[in-house]
Every structure is written in structure tokens, then in C-alpha cells.
């Protein structure tokens, strides 16, 4: 079931003409029972949202008002329930001025009568028959249902009868005529809009206070009727224009509020309470009539006590004379109408003081704000937050597009643009411009100088690559290498008669493929060394492919020609299979016979290298910012990260800020291959650099930038992209992956933590160990890094139940003790193939051993002896092989095995022996079996464990 957000519900209500702010809508939903709604971004189920929409629409949608009569001076007023009063004629002639009598209100019997709306068209009723008065026809006045009874009639009316059960409100009958004919009375003025009481303010000019009871003349029954002379012959009162007393729209709304009768259930009034008492608190049982009006200053609500006006013998809010009305303003008229009223405020809930701020409004974003700027990718969660859309909707749309993603998955800019377009957004790419920090400099031919050639020596292991370089450099590097093989890539600068040459020595072992590939990528020329007595080998072919892939020139040096088994022609023939044809045979490849031991052919080799460099026209600009490639990297204690770099362009100086991969730093020191510190290095020379923030990856490019801040920004940008790629990559499961997972479901895995001296060795060892995995046992590298073995490595291995493999590195102090406490095994190696062989043994140890039964001999039971405290002993004669004390035994009777166990004791005469050979007699005790009988055969054997094969 889909969901709908609160602000979407607000938009639907707005279309229906109901405008609610987000806060008001949330409060309204809380009042309806949806307490889980927290803000305008919260979601509701479709059925819940529809139900809330219908409730709010039914409550807030204005209903058509009933047709009410209108006219000048008339105000529509609602009453809860009004009983028609019984009018009687006065027993004596009225005084000079008729007085106001307090109207009598019917009291409810049990409960307050429910309010029912009056009908739109009310039919007038006939007035009840007056007592002791001449019967005259009562003419119904217009809108009699809304007209109030005259004060004169109220004065003569007896107590009203008890209220009947709730019935529809009937129109009030017009007052009956009295002894003296009276003119029609104007309608009683309705209550005015409430205002806060102002006791300290003096009455307005021209306002006459209310007269005492009996001092006012009766009011006319009909509006606008001429006034009649009083009983004492006083002059008639001038008619009052109703338009002068017509209330405003605000007053009409307030005046139209219903009166709320309030009753307290108390004991009957005693005789003492019937006499006047001093002013003070009202006695219990008093009935007060209250009116609900908006509170002063618009706060909460208030009750107006209108009982005080009734006790004083006048109607609340009675109209004033025309002369007084002319001298008062509208505001003074309103104050006069509501004066002398008692207010009973409702105590509201005290609100905590909060900062007054603008309410959150549902608005539409401007067009310039509907632009999403992203780099190469963005996560689904970030895109949903920017657009204000549910992430589940975006994931559903991506699934329809055929992309299985999660909320944290990264999507490219094109896919994000498609999703954004559906919601009215546009996507702009704001890719990180690396060129701003690493600008490309135009080549200035006038500043180019000749640089030394970079020559990489490649070939199979033990074919004499390092020995050949030693002969050229007149050094003895090969003698100090572990196992006599090169396991690091070495960079050397050699001064020859033909000029300086930079040599890169690469390993020949199969595990160092990545090193050979890096050497081929940075070189200008490849010297392929092939042993004359061994010929072309697998790593020779691999080196040829790497050189051709890099597009560099290959020069073949056929080494070890001084050996008796040397066959240079056979080597040249084998190389033709790989499209390397010697110049002697009409080809283009230079092939020279050399000998590292006798230095035969070395001068010719150097001359050909110089010749090829001249043909290639190797030049570079030394005045620009330096750039190059990382050849090797390592972590040394006391020196930190150390990178061997090859400068390809520009000049690298101490203090330069450089960036390589995700690492950056400032050059603190530089040293050449002889360990001498240098201040600057030109193009074509190798050097060791100190000062980086971490160990870079061998093969990465490095660039010098203006300052360290720029280098840090570039490195952080690359690190962010790498992390996004690792976390947000979407990998589709293929059928082959499922089959591979099913095959390896029962496979055992050997976890390893690899630490090496340099980055290249760490990479090579990890790849070699991973290749050692078989179908029965797999290999998983938990961590591969450079540097000494630390406590962190031990804890990582302990958590992953792994073995630590150290290659040309040693553990720190007390690390071995911590490893023994944690139960972690540390294996140290200096030669890579020794590490591979030892790890295969560890892999075989994970397999369950195979138990094999090996027969030893047989013995026949001749006699059975029962020895106290020892048990049953079978006197037997060894008929085949030998019976050993530590062997297992099967008891066979009638060619059926009835028991299998171990030999408990073996004696010859009275001496304990370890074994008894064939032809001798002995006593054999079987553990856990005491039912040996004469004639049983005891078959003795032993169990041996056989380690299973990894293949």
C-alpha cells in the first residue's frame, strides 16, 4: 500500500479552499488520532490520509446558510429554547411611567434541553387568553419568532410554567393588549459584541444612565410604530430610528451567540433567604445566566453574566434614545451596550514561552532552486532528500528501469537526471576540476633538453638479470638477495661512456607479474634477458607480451653464453615464434650474446642502448612542475612512508607539495640509489621521497602542485570517489556466481594477514597466496599492508582466526608474546616460493585426516583365566604377524565380530611386554569385554591418520 505525505494532504485541502499551515495541519491530525505524525514530511497510509481528508473537509468546508429574513434594524438571534410567556392584565392601573419587570425563564426539569435550530419559516401561534382583560384579536407581527416580549407584558406576567421536554422552538406570540391600548413596541435590542469591562472610564457624553425600576415607559411592540401617550398624560415619546441602533457585522455575530442557562442543584430556598441581604457572595442555589463570547483581546473565551442586568429590572443591552445615539460614536455605542457586565474568564492552559517565528508554509521552489548539482554520482538517499521524495519511490522507479539498488547505492548523473526530470528538477554536473590544481603546460620546444633513457631489464627467474646489471654498475647486488632472486623492483642510475642511463630491475618470479607490467609502462626500452642454456621460459613470454602491450622497443640479451651448454641459435629460433626476428636473420630485433660473468658483449649492449635513445629523441622540460610515476613504496620505522619515484617531467625539489593517488605531502628529503641526499632531481632519474601522508600504490602517478592545501583537496576528492565506488557499486548476481557459490559452500577457508617490506612485495605475495587456493581449501586475505607486524595486526588476526604472514619484515617488540596469548600464529619468510609451500601445508591442516586401518597380527585363544581384581585374561598364541600393546582388537567368534575395542594388557609369562611376535604365547586382556571363550580369534590392528591431498 502506498503512502502519502502530510504536505501532499495539505495541497489537496488547499485545492478545496481550506488553507492550513503545516503546523495547524499536524495539530489537526493529532486531534483526529494520528499521533504518529510528527511534521509535514511524515507519511500516512492512503486509507488514513483519505479518512483524514474527508473529516477535515466535512468540518472545515462551509455549509450553505439557511435563508433568514432581513430588514433594517433586525438581527438574527438564536435561542436555546424559549417558552411563550403567559400574559395577564395588571390588577390596577399602571403608574405614570411603566417599569421594567424581570423576565421569568423556565427552568429545566432534569437536564438542560438540547439546542435545536429554529425553522426557516416559523408560523405564528395565537397568543394565550389574558386574565381579566377584554378579549381582542392579536395580530401577529412580522418575524414574531424573533421578536422579544414587551417589558410591560413581562411585568404583568406570572411565573412561567415548568419547561416541557425538548421540542422544536415555536415562535413567541405577540403580547396581549392591556387595559390601555398601546402602540406596537420595537424589538428589544440584542446583546452587543463583548468588550473588556472598563469600570474606570467615565460614561460618554450624552449618555443617560439606566433609570430605576418603574421609571421607563413601555417600549413599542413593533419597530417604527408611533409612540402612544402615557397613562399620566405625558407627551408621547418621539419614535426611534432603528437604523441608528443597527449593529455592525461583528456585533451581529457576537449578539447572535446563544444564551447558556446554568443551574446549580441545591436544596430549596429557606425563608431567611427570601429577604434582602447585604451585598456579598451569592448564595448557593442561585441561577445565573451566562453568555459565551470571544475573550478580551482575542484570547480564549469568556462568559458574560447577564443575570445582574435582569436583577436591576432592565433588559441587557437595551437601546438608548435617538438623542443619545446621535451624540455618541460607534465605539461609544458599543461600550455603552456592554457596560455594567460581569466577565468570567476561562483559565486556559499556560503555554511555554517560545520564540515567535514564521510558520512553515507549503511552498513551491523557485525555478533556480530546482537545480541539483552533483559530481559523477549521487546516492539514492541524498537524491530523495534534495527533491523531497520518498526514497522507496525512487528505488521502485529504478527497479522498473532494470537497476537493483539500495538506499545507499550510488547512481550516475544520467540516471539521476531521468529521476529528477519526473519531479520537475534538472541535474547539472559539477565535476571536480583537477586541471585547476594540476594545469597542463604547453610544450615549449625551446626549453626541452635531452634526458637519460629509462631501460627496464626483464626476463625469467635465474636468467641473470641482476648479475648483468651488477656487471654494468660494477656492483654486487645479486649476492645480497635472498635465495639469489630479485623480489623488488630496483631503480639505478648508471654513468656510462655513452651518457647516464636509468635501469629498472624487475623480478622474474611468476608472482611479480604486476611489477613487470609497471616496469614496462614507465620505460623507454626493454632489455629482454634470456639464458642461452635454458631458452625461452614462461616468464620470458610474459615479459614479451608486457613490452608489446606497452609499445616499447625490445632489445634481446642472450646471457650465459660462456657456459658449455649454451645454444644462442636455439634461443633465436625460439624467439621467432613470438615475432622477434634477429637482425642477422633479416629482422628488426637486436640480439646480442653477453656474459655477466666475463662481461662479454656489455660494451656493445650499452652502445645499442644509446643508439636507440637517440632514435627515440628522448627530451623533457626541466623548468616545469615535476610529474612522474611511483616505482615502489614501503613503510620504514623511523622514516615513515618512503616512495621510490621516477621523474618523467620537470624537476623535483625538496619542499615541493605533491599528490599521488589518495596520498599527499611535502617532500622532506630525497635520496638516490647510493643513499646520498639530494636537493633536486631532473627528468629521467629515480629517487626516494620522504614526507607523504601514507604509503602510495606502486604504479600511481605523482604531480607537484602549488601548495599543500591544493594537494590535500585533490587527494580527498580521489579518496571520496574511491569510497563511493567501493560502497555504492551495484553488482548483479549471475548464474555462474550462484554455481560457484554452491560449489564452495562446504569449502574450508584459510584467513591470512600479509605484511611485507614494500608495496610491490605485499601485492605479489598476496596474489601468489590467493593462487594457492584449491577446491577443498580457499585462501582469503583479510589485510595486506607494508611495515612491521604490529599489535593491531595481531588483534585483526585473532578476530578473524587468521595466520599472519610476514615477508622480509619482523614483528615489533613483545608482539610474539601477545600473539601467543591470543593464539595467533606468525610465519616469517624471505623467499616467496617458501611462503607458498608453507601456506599449502597450513591449508592441508584444515582438512579432516583420513583414518586408515593397518592390520598387525592375529592370536588364537587357547585358555581363559579369571584373575581377581584384574579380570579375564585370554591365554593366546600368536598365529600371524605381531600383537602390540597399543593396538586395537576385534573379537571374532564363528566368523562374526562380536566386539571391537583396545588391548588393555599384554603379558608374557608374568612380565608386561610391548609386543609379542608370531609363534609365541601370551596373555591378552581386552578392555571392556569379559566374555572371551576358548577358540575365539583376536585380530589386532592399528589406526593411522593420512593427510588428505589439496587437489
From Swiss-Prot:
Binding site for GTP: 459-466, 505-509, 559-562
GO CC annotations on file: cytosol
Region entry G3, spans: 505-508
Predominant subcellular localization, coarse grouping: cytoplasm
Alphabetical keyword list: Cytoplasm, GTP-binding, Initiation factor, Nucleotide-binding, Protein biosynthesis
Family of the protein in this entry: Belongs to the TRAFAC class translation factor GTPase superfamily. Classic translation factor GTPase family. IF-2 subfamily.
UniProt KW Nucleotide-binding keyword: yes
Lineage top rank: taxon: Bacteria
Biased composition (Pro residues): 171-216
SUPFAM superfamilies: Initiation factor IF2/eIF5b, domain 3 (SSF52156), P-loop containing nucleoside triphosphate hydrolases (SSF52540), Translation proteins (SSF50447)
Region G5: start-end pairs: 595-597
Every tr-type G domain range: 450-619
Region (G2): 484-488
PROSITE patterns: G_TR_2, IF2
Positions of region (Disordered): 58-255, 305-329
Protein name: Translation initiation factor IF-2
Ranges of biased composition (kind: Low complexity): 101-170, 217-234
Amino acid at each position: 500500500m502506498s503512502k502519502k505525505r502530510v504536505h501532499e494532504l495539505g495541497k489537496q485541502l488547499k485545492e478545496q479552499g481550506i488553507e492550513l499551515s503545516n503546523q495547524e495541519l499536524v495539530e489537526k491530525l493529532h486531534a483526529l488520532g494520528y499521533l504518529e505524525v510528527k511534521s509535514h514530511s511524515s507519511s500516512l497510509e492512503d486509507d488514513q490520509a483519505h479518512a483524514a481528508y474527508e473529516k477535515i473537509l466535512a468540518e472545515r468546508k462551509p455549509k450553505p446558510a439557511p435563508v433568514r429574513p432581513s430588514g433594517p434594524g433586525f438581527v438574527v438571534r438564536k435561542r436555546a429554547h424559549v417558552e411563550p410567556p403567559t400574559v395577564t392584565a395588571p390588577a390596577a392601573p399602571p403608574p405614570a411611567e411603566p417599569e421594567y419587570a424581570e423576565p421569568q425563564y423556565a427552568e429545566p426539569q432534569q437536564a438542560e434541553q438540547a439546542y435545536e435550530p429554529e425553522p426557516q419559516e416559523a408560523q405564528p401561534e395565537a397568543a394565550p387568553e389574558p386574565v381579566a382583560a377584554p378579549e381582542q384579536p392579536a395580530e401577529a407581527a412580522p418575524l414574531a419568532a424573533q421578536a422579544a416580549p414587551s417589558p410591560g407584558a413581562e411585568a404583568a406576567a406570572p411565573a412561567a410554567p415548568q419547561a416541557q421536554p425538548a421540542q422544536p422552538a415555536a415562535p413567541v406570540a405577540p403580547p396581549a393588549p392591556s387595559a390601555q391600548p398601546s402602540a406596537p413596541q420595537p424589538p428589544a435590542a440584542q446583546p452587543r459584541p463583548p468588550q473588556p469591562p472598563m469600570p474606570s472610564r467615565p460614561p460618554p457624553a450624552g449618555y443617560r444612565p439606566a433609570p430605576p425600576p418603574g421609571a421607563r415607559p413601555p417600549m413599542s411592540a413593533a419597530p417604527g410604530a408611533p409612540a402612544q401617550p402615557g397613562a399620566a398624560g405625558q407627551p408621547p415619546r418621539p419614535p426611534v430610528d432603528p437604523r441608528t441602533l443597527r449593529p455592525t457585522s461583528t456585533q451581529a455575530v457576537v449578539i447572535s451567540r446563544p444564551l447558556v442557562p446554568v443551574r446549580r442543584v441545591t436544596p430549596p430556598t429557606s425563608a431567611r433567604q427570601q429577604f434582602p441581604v447585604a451585598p456579598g457572595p451569592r448564595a448557593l442555589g442561585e441561577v445565573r445566566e451566562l453568555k459565551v463570547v470571544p475573550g478580551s483581546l482575542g484570547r480564549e473565551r469568556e462568559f458574560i453574566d447577564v443575570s445582574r442586568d435582569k436583577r436591576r429590572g432592565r433588559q441587557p443591552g437595551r437601546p438608548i434614545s435617538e438623542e443619545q445615539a446621535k451624540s455618541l460614536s460607534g465605539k461609544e455605542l458599543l461600550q455603552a451596550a456592554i457596560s455594567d457586565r460581569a466577565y468570567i474568564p476561562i483559565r486556559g492552559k499556560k503555554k511555554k514561552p517560545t520564540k515567535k517565528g514564521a510558520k512553515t508554509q507549503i511552498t513551491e521552489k523557485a525555478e533556480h532552486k530546482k537545480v541539483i548539482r552533483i559530481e559523477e554520482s549521487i546516492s539514492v538517499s541524498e537524491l530523495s532528500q534534495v527533491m523531497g521524495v520518498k526514497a522507496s519511490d525512487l528505488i521502485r522507479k529504478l527497479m522498473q528501469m532494470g537497476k537493483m539498488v539500495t538506499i545507499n547505492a550510488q547512481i550516475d548523473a544520467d540516471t539521476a537526471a531521468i529521476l529528477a526530470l519526473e519531479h520537475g528538477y534538472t541535474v547539472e554536473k559539477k565535476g571536480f576540476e583537477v586541471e585547476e590544481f594540476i594545469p597542463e603546460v604547453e610544450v615549449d620546444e625551446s626549453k626541452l633538453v635531452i634526458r637519460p633513457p629509462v631501460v627496464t631489464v626483464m626476463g625469467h627467474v635465474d636468467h641473470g638479470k641482476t648479475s648483468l646489471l651488477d656487471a654494468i654498475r660494477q656492483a654486487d647486488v645479486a649476492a645480497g638477495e635472498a635465495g639469489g632472486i630479485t623480489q623488488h623492483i630496483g631503480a639505478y642510475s648508471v654513468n656510462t661512456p655513452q651518457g647516464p642511463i636509468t635501469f629498472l630491475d624487475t623480478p622474474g618470479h611468476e608472482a611479480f607479474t604486476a611489477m613487470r607490467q609497471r616496469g614496462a609502462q614507465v620505460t623507454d626500452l626493454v632489455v629482454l634477458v634470456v639464458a642461452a642454456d635454458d631458452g625461452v621460459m614462461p616468464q620470458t613470454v610474459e615479459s614479451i607480451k608486457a613490452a608489446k602491450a606497452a609499445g616499447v622497443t625490445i632489445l634481446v640479451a642472450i646471457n650465459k653464453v660462456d657456459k658449455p651448454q649454451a645454444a644462442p641459435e636455439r634461443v633465436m629460433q625460439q624467439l621467432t615464434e613470438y615475432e622477434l626476428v634477429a637482425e642477422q636473420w633479416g629482422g628488426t630485433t637486436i640480439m646480442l650474446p653477453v656474459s655477466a660473468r666475463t662481461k662479454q658483449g656489455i660494451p656493445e649492449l650499452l652502445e645499442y642502448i644509446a643508439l636507440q635513445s637517440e632514435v627515440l629523441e628522448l627530451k623533457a622540460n626541466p623548468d616545469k612542475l615535476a610529474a612522474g610515476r611511483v616505482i615502489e613504496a614501503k613503510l620504514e620505522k623511523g622514516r615513515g612512508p618512503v616512495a621510490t619515484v621516477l621523474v618523467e617531467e620537470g624537476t623535483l625539489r625538496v619542499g615541493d607539495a605533491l599528490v599521488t593517488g589518495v596520498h599527499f605531502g611535502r617532500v622532506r628529503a630525497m635520496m638516490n640509489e647510493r643513499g646520498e641526499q639530494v636537493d633536486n632531481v631532473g627528468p629521467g632519474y629515480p629517487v626516494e621521497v620522504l614526507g607523504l601522508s601514507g604509503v602510495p600504490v606502486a604504479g600511481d602517478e605523482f604531480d607537484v602542485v602549488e601548495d599543500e592545501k591544493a594537494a590535500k583537496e585533490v587527494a580527498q576528492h580521489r579518496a571520496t570517489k574511491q569510497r563511493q565506488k567501493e560502497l555504492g557499486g551495484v553488482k548483479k548476481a549471475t548464474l555462474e556466481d550462484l554455481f560457484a557459490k554452491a560449489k564452495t559452500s562446504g569449502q574450508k577457508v584459510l584467513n591470512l594477514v600479509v605484511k611485507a617490506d614494500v608495496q610491490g612485495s605485499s601485492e605479489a605475495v598476496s596474489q601468489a597466496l590467493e593462487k594457492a587456493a584449491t577446491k577443498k581449501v580457499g585462501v582469503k586475505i583479510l589485510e595486506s599492508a607494508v611495515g612491521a607486524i604490529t599489535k593491531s595486526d595481531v588483534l585483526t588476526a585473532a578476530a578473524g582466526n587468521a595466520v599472519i604472514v610476514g615477508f622480509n619484515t619482523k614483528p615489533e617488540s613483545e608482539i610474539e608474546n601477545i600473539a601467543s596469548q591470543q593464539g595467533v600464529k606468525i610465519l616469517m619468510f624471505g623467499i616467496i616460493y617458501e611462503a607458498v609451500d608453507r601456506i599449502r601445508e597450513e591449508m592441508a591442516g584444515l582438512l579432516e585426516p583420513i583414518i586408515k586401518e593397518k592390520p598387525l597380527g592375529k592370536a588364537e585363544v587357547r585358555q581363559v583365566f579369571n584373575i581377581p581384581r584384574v579380570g579375564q585374561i585370554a591365554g593366546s598364541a600368536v598365529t600371524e604377524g605381531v600383537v602390540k600393546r597399543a593396538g586395537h582388537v576385534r573379537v571374532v567368534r564363528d566368523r562374526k565380530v562380536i566386539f571391537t575395542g583396545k588391548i588393555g594388557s599384554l603379558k608374557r609369562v608374568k612380565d608386561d611386554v610391548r609386543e609379542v611376535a608370531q609363534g609365541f604365547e601370551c596373555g591378552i586382556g581386552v578392555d571392556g569385554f569379559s566374555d572371551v571363550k576358548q577358540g575365539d580369534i583376536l585380530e589386532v590392528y592399528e589406526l593411522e591418520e593420512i593427510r588428505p591431498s589439496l587437489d
